[in-house]
Amino acid sequence: MPKIGPMEILIIVLLVVVVFGVGKLPQVGDAIGKGIRNFRKASTGEDAKEEVETKEETKPAEKSE
């Protein structure tokens, strides 16, 4: 498998700047970061834990008399 060096990374960054423009870079970076974060959560199973916790928190409270 070919290794990615600093020159290849620079070329990729330049291509991203040309394609998306400087104004869109923060939005693109944010979207990529969220995607990576969601992928990591899904691969470690944190989503399932959060769903269980959310369901427990949303149970209706018992009425007091």
UniProtKB/Swiss-Prot annotation:
Keywords: Cell membrane, Membrane, Protein transport, Translocation, Transmembrane, Transmembrane helix, Transport
Subcellular localization, as worded in the UniProt entry: Cell membrane
Membrane topology annotation: Single-pass membrane protein
GO biological process: protein transport by the Tat complex
TM ranges: 9-29
Molecular functions (GO terms): protein transmembrane transporter activity
Pfam families, sorted: TatA_B_E (PF02416)
Bias (Basic and acidic residues) ranges: 43-65
InterPro entries: TatA/B/E (IPR003369), TatA/E (IPR006312)
Chief location category: membrane
One Gene Ontology term, aspect cellular component: TAT protein transport complex
Region Disordered, annotated ranges: 40-65
Highest taxon listed in the record's lineage: Bacteria
Matches recorded under NCBIfam families: tatAE
Annotated PANTHER family: SEC-INDEPENDENT PROTEIN TRANSLOCASE PROTEIN TATA (PTHR42982:SF1)
Subunit structure, as described in the record: Forms a complex with TatC.
Family, as annotated: Belongs to the TatA/E family.
Protein purpose: Part of the twin-arginine translocation (Tat) system that transports large folded proteins containing a characteristic twin-arginine motif in their signal peptide across membranes. TatA could form the protein-conducting channel of the Tat system.
The protein's name in its UniProt record: Sec-independent protein translocase protein TatA
The species this protein was found in: Dehalococcoides mccartyi (strain ATCC BAA-2100 / JCM 16839 / KCTC 5957 / BAV1)
